[in-house]
Structure formats: C-alpha cells, structure tokens
Amino acid sequence: MNPRLRSAAFIALFAFAGAVMAAKPDKTVVPPVPAGQAQIVFLRHSVVSAKANTLIYETTSGQPKVLGIIPNNRKLVVSVPPGDHVFMIGNLPTCDFLQASVLADKRYYAVVVSRWPDGFTLRPVRGRESAQQGEYSYGHAEYPDLLKYTTLAGRAPDSYVQSELKNAETHYPGKWQQWQSKTPEQKAMLTLKAEDSEG
C-alpha cells in the first residue's frame, strides 16, 4: 500500500475509534436533578455479600413500591417530590429502613451497607460539617471510591421484581412496626436530612 494511503487509513481509523469512544456514555455519571424534584443516589460498593442482589423500595404511602435493583458496584438514581419519604432495602424478611426529608432541586446520597450473611442497611451521606463519628460524609475517605467505582444500575427482571414484591407486601407491616421501636437517636442516624444535600 502506498505510504501516504497507509497513513491516511491509520488517521481515519483512530478518528473513528475516538468518535466511538466519545459517543459512549459514561455510566458512572449521575444525570442532572429534574427541575422541581429531589434526587437521591443510592451507592453500593462492598466486598461483603458482593454477589447478592437486593431491591430498594419506597414505603412512604404504607405500601411497598419497587424503585429498582442495586447489585454490587452500582448506583441507583431516584427522583422524588420534595418532602418526607421512607425507603426500604432488603430481601424480605430481612430489611431495613431510611427516612428522608428532601428539598426540591437538590441531590442527596445514601450508601448501601452490606451485613453478613444477607442483610443490607442504608446510611445517609452527611454534609462535611454535620457528620458524626462513624457516619458517611462528603469528606469521608471512602466517598470518592463510591462514586468512581459504581455505574448506573439497570432494570430488574420483572419476574424477580414481582416475586420480591409479594414477599415485601407480606413482611413489611411487621418489619416497619419493629423499626418504630428504635430510639430517637437510632432513628436520627437512619434519617437523610434536608441539609445533607450535595454542595
């Protein structure tokens, strides 16, 4: 092949490869917060129970509603109206709850913490100034890795969702009543506050 043609072919090939890479979306990037809504990003990155999947529900109305599946090394992005909400995580009958009070046009984060052998809990990410010892915050040493090593969660198979939802509807009332017996201090640690927004 003519050297000039060979050079032109290599240039075209690299240009095409660059265009393909540029067009490929970055699945670690969180989409913008929808106007008038609050956004909550659930992050999961752990070596504990790494192969186990679990669902996140909203139970604000008193009826479990599946928000999505969150395998390990994934982030589940949820948009909700501003105000008070209750979220549930777990493979019922094992579950835990997170209360949230969120503002419009703000983004919040919560970390999925795996508990051996098959339990999960949700921990709010606090502002740098308000975090207590043992709590996650935007200044926490693990926080950058939680963002970097998690990609956007996909859709859960319908059969899996329906099976787990039936389980949730059966066990939710008793588990929520049990959670209510926690002390105010314990509940506060499991509550995402309006001032915990990013930035």
Predicted regions, residues:
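Bacterial N-terminal signal peptides that target proteins for export
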Residues: 1-10
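Short loop/turn and low-complexity linker motifs enriched in small/turn-promoting residues
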Residues: 22-199
